[in-house]
């Protein structure tokens, strides 16, 4: 589960600009749910070698009603889940009643809050920050997100320490969780109302989860351990459900954050798609996020029953076009969660994907496969010399990491890297799991000796003179 930074504040203070700076505008996950008037942005960022999630919460106002009230609740969910809150205000326009409203909400939470005074370019920083100390938060810092002024200092000063502390604690906790983990841990992800809860009940064989037609009405992710044919599992239904005891509550708490964290905490991710609605940009965002995080993947296309043959052909063509990047290594099952059609095959693919993601490969086998790949198709020339791959070994599991050492590997083209991935995947029969390749430049064992010899020869020549 990643460290989470929530960017909050009233509208038009520069939250999205700061989001883009922290994430380098890359891999933004934008979700546009039915009944939601504004997109939400979730991004992955990195500080040193540590990953963290950033959420741009949208504007919070005391006048939020209707859909805006829904979005305000989403912002409060983000605050509740956050490890660190960047409360962004406008240093140019000064303190407003809207800022005071957001501050009052944050004071009710036991959260680490940094008041980020934005848009201070051309103004005196100390003067711009002064009035915002009245909120009662100790940490106040001035930046210009648009010009990247002080943004690196912001993360160095306020993010570095809590991020490192979090991952020190998380590593110890994660080791304990792995020891206590009940079998294969898999999550069901997808848009609200695609049938995840029905599929959960079908997999469990009982009505453990109450199903609702209204999208986005969830209290929390539901985690349930169970056993099937001697294999232990833990299933996580990430959204679209409410626990039986909470039926009377009307909280609309669909949390994308919960979904992203469930993906990171799973061995295998089952992406559930509604066959009648087709695959959406949001589905693709979740699938990309799972792959980027190295998660084994299975695709379940639900509500397949009752569709005409013509519609089924159209759905399959649409899937092939939009999921081309999966390179046919992910199993796709056309199911009916309601009637149980093909659900058993989903379990088979979960087992296969988990086994492949954790397959043990020796250094000898990895090197042998690399040599076979090179014999079949040599790396390209770089100038007068050919890129040389020397040996390979396994660098990790879930996902499998193959580390290849050689000369000039930094200049290896992406096309050859894809060739190696396909070669290893076919040779090892990897299904459902991404494969991560790392390329490392081999050290020249004679470099120091050569330099030393050059120095010795230089000394001798001086003595001769």
Swiss-Prot record:
A Pfam family recorded for this sequence: KH_dom-like
Start and end residues of each stretch annotated as Disordered: 446-465
One Gene Ontology MF term: GTP binding
Biological processes per GO annotation: ribosome biogenesis
Gene3D superfamilies: 3.30.300.20, P-loop containing nucleotide triphosphate hydrolases
Keywords: GTP-binding, Nucleotide-binding, Repeat, Ribosome biogenesis
Annotated binding of GTP 2, by residue: 190-197, 237-241, 302-305
Residues annotated as domain EngA-type G: 3-166, 184-358
The KH-like domain, residue ranges: 359-443
Amino-acid positions noted as binding GTP 1 in the UniProt annotation, renumbered to this chain: 9-16, 56-60, 118-121
Top-level taxon of the source organism: Bacteria
Record has Repeat as a keyword: yes
InterPro entries noted in UniProt: G_ENGA, GTP-bd, GTPase_Der, KH_dom-like, KH_dom-like_a/b, P-loop_NTPase, Small_GTP-bd
Assembly and interaction partners: Associates with the 50S ribosomal subunit.
NCBIfam families from the UniProt entry: GTPase_EngA, small_GTP
Assigned protein family: Belongs to the TRAFAC class TrmE-Era-EngA-EngB-Septin-like GTPase superfamily. EngA (Der) GTPase family.
Function per UniProt: GTPase that plays an essential role in the late steps of ribosome biogenesis.
Protein name: GTPase Der
Source organism of the structure: Francisella tularensis subsp. novicida (strain U112)
Gene name per UniProt: der
């Amino acid at each position: 589960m990643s460290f989470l930074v929530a960017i909050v504040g009233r509208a038009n203070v520069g939250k999205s600009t700061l989001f883009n700076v922290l994430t380098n505008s890359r891999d933004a996950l934008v979700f546009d749910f039915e009944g939601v008037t504004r997109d939400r942005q979730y991004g992955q960022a990195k500080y040193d070698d540590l990953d963290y999630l950033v959420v741009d919460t949208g504007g919070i106002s005391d006048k939020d009603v209707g859909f805006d009230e829904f979005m305000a609740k989403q912002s409060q969910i983000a605050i509740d889940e956050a490890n660190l809150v960047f409360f962004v205000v406008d240093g140019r326009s000064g303190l407003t009643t809207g800022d005071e409203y957001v501050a009052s909400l944050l004071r009710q939470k036991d959260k680490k809050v940094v008041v980020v005074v934005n848009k201070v370019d051309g103004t005196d920083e100390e003067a711009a920050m002064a009035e915002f100390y009245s909120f009662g938060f100790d940490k106040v810092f001035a930046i210009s997100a648009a010009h990247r002024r002080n943004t690196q200092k912001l993360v160095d000063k306020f993010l570095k320490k809590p991020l490192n502390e979090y991952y020190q604690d998380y590593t110890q906790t994660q080791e304990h969780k792995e020891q206590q983990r009940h079998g294969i841990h898999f999550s069901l992800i997808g848009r609200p109302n695609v049938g995840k809860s029905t599929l959960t009940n079908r997999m469990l064989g009982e009505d453990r989860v109450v199903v609702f037609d209204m999208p986005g009405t969830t209290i929390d992710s539901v985690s349930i351990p169970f056993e099937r044919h001697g294999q232990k599992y833990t299933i996580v239904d990430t959204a679209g459900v409410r626990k039986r005891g909470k039926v009377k509550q009307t909280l609309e708490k669909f949390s994308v954050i919960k979904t992203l964290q469930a993906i990171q905490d799973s061995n295998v991710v089952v992406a559930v798609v509604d066959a009648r609605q087709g695959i959406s940009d949001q589905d693709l965002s979740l699938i990309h996020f799972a792959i980027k995080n190295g998660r084994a993947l299975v695709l379940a296309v639900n509500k397949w029953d009752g569709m005409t043959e013509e519609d089924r052909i159209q759905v399959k063509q649409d899937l092939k076009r939009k999921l081309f990047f999966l390179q046919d290594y992910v199993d796709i099952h056309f199911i009916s969660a309601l009637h149980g059609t093909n659900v058993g095959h989903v379990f088979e693919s979960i087992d296969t994907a988990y086994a492949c993601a954790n397959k043990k490969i020796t250094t000898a086998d990895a090197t042998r496969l690399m040599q076979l790949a090179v014999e079949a198709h040599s790396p390209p020339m770089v100038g007068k010399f050919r890129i040389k791959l020397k040996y390979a070994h396994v660098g990790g599991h879930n996902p499998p990491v193959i580390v290849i050492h050689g000369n000039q590997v930094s200049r290896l083209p992406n096309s050859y890297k894809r060739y190696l991935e396909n070669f290893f995947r076919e040779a090892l029969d990897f299904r459902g799991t991404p494969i991560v390749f790392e390329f490392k430049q081999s050290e020249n064992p004679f470099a120091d000796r050569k330099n030393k010899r050059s120095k010795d020869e230089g000394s001798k020549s001086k003595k001769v003179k």
